[in-house]
Amino acid sequence: MSAKKPLALVILDGWGYREDNSDNAIANANTPVMDSLIANEANTLISASGFDVGLPDGQMGNSEVGHTNIGAGRVVYQDLTRITKSIADGDFFENEALTTAMDKAINAGKAVHIMGLMSPGGVHSHEDHIAAAIEMAAKRGAEKIYLHCFLDGRDTPPRSAQNSLERFDALFAELGKGRTASLVGRYYAMDRDNNWDRVEVAYNLLSAAKADFTVDSAVAGLTDAYSRDENDEFVKATEIRAEGQESAAMVDGDTVIFMNYRADRAREITRAFEADFTSFVRTQTPALAEFVMLTRYAANIKLPAAFPPATLKNTLGEWLSKKGKKQLRISETEKYAHVTFFFNGGVEDEFDGETRSLVASPKVATYDLQPEMSAPELTEKLVAAIKGGEFDTIICNYPNGDMVGHTGVYDAAVKACEALDGCIGQVVEAIKSVGGQLLITADHGNAEMMINPETGGVHTAHTNLPVPLIYVGDKSLTLKDGGKLSDLAPTMLSLSDIEIPAEMTGQVLFDLK
């Protein structure tokens, strides 16, 4: 069999386009390869946020949303909008998974624990959903409602949690029941890279009220954390308990509702509540009445989900498999789930003909300490796969722009972009050497805005700006403007001379000659 000439899609995570060069790590980095590609190859900008990816208008994109839209070849109605709509329609308050779980605890006189990322950021959760769950528990008769706050500072400004905490203090006062019971940064509660020592801190706080600090109010806990120079993301385990209040530790018969809807950073803390969990020794294992996931975090987590995934038929991965094509998915640990699970529309298992390759992300506290991450090793494997002649289609994600962008350290983000540029040069050379085709894009922006232009503070969140799309291959092809992420799969099928399934409603972004 002759060697295949692959079509590779390289996703530069967090590599957005912004006209303003100020505090723009991408524009100000020394990137001769990317500059040359923009000057000499077909390229355009495409949308990766808001309505174009199934989010509310103006809402910044994120990796889960981006990869789901890319892989689906159609705009996918995201969990954020789906859940928000259900609250507005009233369906949320009759959701069977939620009502059953709450009523089990309420009828036994036990507590309803509501936990999640306390944030208006809309990436992993939304505090409006958390407020609705609290109101629902109160209306159903819960007397003990405990809110466990994971603080953001990553998809929101680094010190922005106070407004949210005050909002919920006011809500509990209005309801006349319930309280905020704990605070902890998402660094501990929402790890996704098997840093079980961090997860253990959060688990002990939630299950046993074991904390580094105990204070009498949420705002006091936050103020103390700031005085220790801890931004929201890194706030240490803090119990909120005023004198005379009983502990909010979880006990037998309690119910837990986990209000994050994005799966990747919800899995580890959820697994810590499973009966057969062994990644660290648990000091307390309450026999909960129910633990409800807002969405399904993984197929092998056997817990109820309030909003199970909608099934996406004939995603790019499934369609390539049906057509007998060989495909490779490759990334570092940090974005491995995105090029596999999310790209496949929430399908955990590989399709026939799909190979997965994982490169371990470096074990550092924060990625500004190693901005190149594992890009050199990833590139070595990617180049070998391109030249190996085995695969028809290759999907690769480089996490650097996003993961280093999230640290808010500008110089490190510049170094990350420069490291990537060298890697892209090797990939382009490999593609050309085998007569293949290459598309370079991003799932959302991040590193192009390292300072918030409104506040002047460090900007660690994603952006709602467009992302590049570059094509290396047939010089006769030109790219259309006005595209979006969901146009990539039909475009790739067209480039591969494969028919496009009816479910893919995205447009082909080439003016085919």
From Swiss-Prot:
<dbReference type="InterPro" id="IPR011258">
    <property type="entry name" value="BPG-indep_PGM_N"/>
</dbReference>
<keyword id="KW-0479">Metal-binding</keyword>
<dbReference type="Pfam" id="PF01676">
    <property type="entry name" value="Metalloenzyme"/>
</dbReference>
<feature type="binding site">
    <location>
        <position position="406"/>
    </location>
    <ligand>
        <name>Mn(2+) 1</name>
    </ligand>
</feature>
<comment type="subunit">
    <text>Monomer.</text>
</comment>
<feature type="binding site">
    <location>
        <position position="335"/>
    </location>
    <ligand>
        <name>substrate</name>
    </ligand>
</feature>
<feature type="binding site">
    <location>
        <position position="444"/>
    </location>
    <ligand>
        <name>Mn(2+) 2</name>
    </ligand>
</feature>
<feature type="binding site">
    <location>
        <position position="124"/>
    </location>
    <ligand>
        <name>substrate</name>
    </ligand>
</feature>
<comment type="function">
    <text>Catalyzes the interconversion of 2-phosphoglycerate and 3-phosphoglycerate.</text>
</comment>
<dbReference type="GO" id="GO:0005829">
    <property type="term" value="C:cytosol"/>
</dbReference>
<protein>
    <recommendedName>
        <fullName>2,3-bisphosphoglycerate-independent phosphoglycerate mutase</fullName>
        <ecNumber>5.4.2.12</ecNumber>
    </recommendedName>
</protein>
<dbReference type="InterPro" id="IPR017850">
    <property type="entry name" value="Alkaline_phosphatase_core_sf"/>
</dbReference>
<keyword id="KW-0324">Glycolysis</keyword>
<comment type="similarity">
    <text>Belongs to the BPG-independent phosphoglycerate mutase family.</text>
</comment>
<keyword id="KW-0464">Manganese</keyword>
<dbReference type="GO" id="GO:0004619">
    <property type="term" value="F:phosphoglycerate mutase activity"/>
</dbReference>
<dbReference type="InterPro" id="IPR005995">
    <property type="entry name" value="Pgm_bpd_ind"/>
</dbReference>
<dbReference type="InterPro" id="IPR006124">
    <property type="entry name" value="Metalloenzyme"/>
</dbReference>
<feature type="binding site">
    <location>
        <position position="443"/>
    </location>
    <ligand>
        <name>Mn(2+) 2</name>
    </ligand>
</feature>
<keyword id="KW-0413">Isomerase</keyword>
<feature type="binding site">
    <location>
        <position position="63"/>
    </location>
    <ligand>
        <name>Mn(2+) 2</name>
    </ligand>
</feature>
<feature type="active site" description="Phosphoserine intermediate">
    <location>
        <position position="63"/>
    </location>
</feature>
<dbReference type="Pfam" id="PF06415">
    <property type="entry name" value="iPGM_N"/>
</dbReference>
<feature type="binding site">
    <location>
        <position position="462"/>
    </location>
    <ligand>
        <name>Mn(2+) 1</name>
    </ligand>
</feature>
<dbReference type="GO" id="GO:0006096">
    <property type="term" value="P:glycolytic process"/>
</dbReference>
<feature type="binding site">
    <location>
        <position position="402"/>
    </location>
    <ligand>
        <name>Mn(2+) 1</name>
    </ligand>
</feature>
<dbReference type="GO" id="GO:0006007">
    <property type="term" value="P:glucose catabolic process"/>
</dbReference>
<dbReference type="GO" id="GO:0030145">
    <property type="term" value="F:manganese ion binding"/>
</dbReference>
<feature type="binding site">
    <location>
        <position position="13"/>
    </location>
    <ligand>
        <name>Mn(2+) 2</name>
    </ligand>
</feature>
<feature type="binding site">
    <location>
        <begin position="262"/>
        <end position="265"/>
    </location>
    <ligand>
        <name>substrate</name>
    </ligand>
</feature>
<feature type="binding site">
    <location>
        <position position="192"/>
    </location>
    <ligand>
        <name>substrate</name>
    </ligand>
</feature>
<feature type="binding site">
    <location>
        <begin position="154"/>
        <end position="155"/>
    </location>
    <ligand>
        <name>substrate</name>
    </ligand>
</feature>
<comment type="pathway">
    <text>Carbohydrate degradation; glycolysis; pyruvate from D-glyceraldehyde 3-phosphate: step 3/5.</text>
</comment>
<feature type="binding site">
    <location>
        <position position="186"/>
    </location>
    <ligand>
        <name>substrate</name>
    </ligand>
</feature>
<dbReference type="InterPro" id="IPR036646">
    <property type="entry name" value="PGAM_B_sf"/>
</dbReference>
